[in-house]
Amino acid sequence: MNPHATPVLVLSLALGTTITISSNHWVLAWTGLEINTLAIIPLISKSHHPRAVEAATKYFLTQAAASALVLFSSMTNAWATGQWDITQLNHPTSCLLLTAAIAIKLGLVPFHFWFPEVLQGSPLMTALLLSTLMKFPPLTLLLMTSKSLNPALLTTMALASAALGGWMGLNQTQTRKILAFSSISHLGWIAIILVYNPKLALLTFYLYTIMTSAVFMALNKIKALNLSMILTSWTKTPVLNATLMLVLLSLAGLPPLTGFMPKWLIIQELTKQEMTPAAMAIAMLSLLSLFFYLRLAYHSTITLPPNSSNHMKQWYTSKPPSTPTAILASLSILLLPLSPMIHAIV
């Protein structure tokens, strides 16, 4: 790829995202989503590997179908109510179509099949964009229409996402697929609270973005595409691996770390809404994800690859430190004590 193309594509992603999140008209929102889709496809297929081309094709087909559904939903609503305003989605069929369209775009169960395959075929930094930035515009549309959405449908999809995201991640050895199922599981937590407290859903997404970005950047630094590559990276980058372990435990939602905050607040909010069974179910389903996060953490720090007895360990980092990774990792680990302030601001 031409070196000048990447900045243009990244700027196009920023433009598409900005158009969608700032628009109040369905056609403008749809335009932003289309710009995003067209900008990310060259980044997915950058390596010209058959798997990358396959991933780009799958991504294009699913996103095109979802965009068509968004347009159809908005046209149905405009036909019935005479409104093109995003917040005025009142027609029941339009609400159902929009929920399906956004679920396809986000990769919520049962429309999740494309997401792990596309992530597996993408470079690590493109996979980071797909897991974080590309989910922001569709999620914004869900937040803007949250008053009109069906709570029972979203709760069902959320619980299914948490279950399937945890279950399918158990036997994976590829880091990108593990993080894809982790993303599906986290989307379940966001979807279950979206109708009742949209601001809390947005906070959960922000914290998920910080933690996932830290993991992807650390994996990109050590070039770890599967578990065995993480296993052999400990001798080269011990500090980065130890940090990666803590960030993974934070993603799992263990108490002293940042990732515990959104889970705690969501369970508290669900209990207030008298949805204790749903809160219990999603809390229990998060144990499935905890297993594969622990396995990743175990591989990154606790186990060492088999070496001969005269093998010299390299107790120095072979790669220069990265400031963005350090900042994101610190935020992923240390924000829990600030949770009252963060919750008050949000």
Curated annotation (Swiss-Prot):
Family per similarity comment: Belongs to the complex I subunit 2 family.
Enzyme class: translocase
Superkingdom field: Eukaryota
Keywords, in A-Z order: Electron transport, Membrane, Mitochondrion, Mitochondrion inner membrane, NAD, Respiratory chain, Translocase, Transmembrane, Transmembrane helix, Transport, Ubiquinone
PANTHER family hit by this protein: NADH-UBIQUINONE OXIDOREDUCTASE CHAIN 2 (PTHR46552:SF1)
Cellular component annotations (GO), alphabetically ordered: mitochondrial inner membrane
Record's keyword annotation contains Membrane: yes
Entry-linked InterPro entries: Complex_I_Subunit_2, NADH_DH_su2_C, NADH_UbQ_OxRdtase_chain2, ND/Mrp_TM
E.C. designation(s): 7.1.1.2
Reaction equations catalysed: a ubiquinone + NADH + 5 H(+)(in) = a ubiquinol + NAD(+) + 4 H(+)(out)
Membrane topology: Multi-pass membrane protein
An example molecular function term from Gene Ontology annotations: NADH dehydrogenase (ubiquinone) activity
TM helices/strands, residue ranges: 1-21, 25-45, 60-80, 95-115, 124-144, 149-169, 178-195, 200-219, 242-262, 274-294, 326-346
Organism of this sequence: Sibirionetta formosa
Cellular localisation: Mitochondrion inner membrane
Protein name as annotated: NADH-ubiquinone oxidoreductase chain 2
GO BP, sorted A to Z: mitochondrial electron transport, NADH to ubiquinone
Keyword NAD: yes
Protein task: Core subunit of the mitochondrial membrane respiratory chain NADH dehydrogenase (Complex I) that is believed to belong to the minimal assembly required for catalysis. Complex I functions in the transfer of electrons from NADH to the respiratory chain. The immediate electron acceptor for the enzyme is believed to be ubiquinone.
